[in-house]
């Protein structure tokens, strides 16, 4: 639908996620050009399929490596620490996704008849997954942290200064306690440290 300005705010499909952010970036660069502040070339890659995995983007990037060469990447789709707190995200953790297939008997076995005699694939998978994160919240996969950057003293100070209410965070997601890697704050774990999460078993 057509964008409409109401009470000084832009209402439109995607205004919040993510066309609004992209529009802000475009306007910022427009101002920089008009004011003579831009000292480099800028390239825009805009696509609208992020919510379905951005089909075609990977192939496009591989086919146009020279065109897309750059020193810095600016991304629109990031979070804010609060509705009233403007936020600049200076880095993203990235994503690695795997599917693990565990095989067993040639059919679904009745646990009352076969239980205790045959390894249950789901039980075996749970054993594997249970060992991936230790009691301190650290991921045990070999070399997992080899290229993970250390949270700097400056970054920790900046995150520590962010107006953040952990109790409100817990209430919003309906939990009594938070967990994760020991030695880091919730914001540090959520923004600077890697995590291991199981997204489904079927």
Where are these regions (language model features)?
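Active-site metal-coordination/substrate-binding segment of hydrolases
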Residues: 1-43
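Short glycine- and Lys/Arg-enriched binding-loop motifs that mark or flank ligand-binding interfaces
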Residues: 4, 8-10, 16, 49, ...
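Short, well-ordered turn and helix-capping elements at secondary-structure junctions
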Residues: 7, 48, 78, 200-202
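Active-site-proximal alpha-helical scaffold in enzymes
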Residues: 19-35, 54-61, 119-131
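Generic secondary-structure signature for well-ordered alpha-helical cores
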Residues: 34-37, 65-66, 105, 127-138
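Histidine/acidic-residue-rich, glycine-tolerant segments that coordinate divalent metal ions
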Residues: 39-120
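Acidic-enriched catalytic cores of C-N bond-cleaving enzymes acting on peptides and small amides
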Residues: 81, 90, 111-201
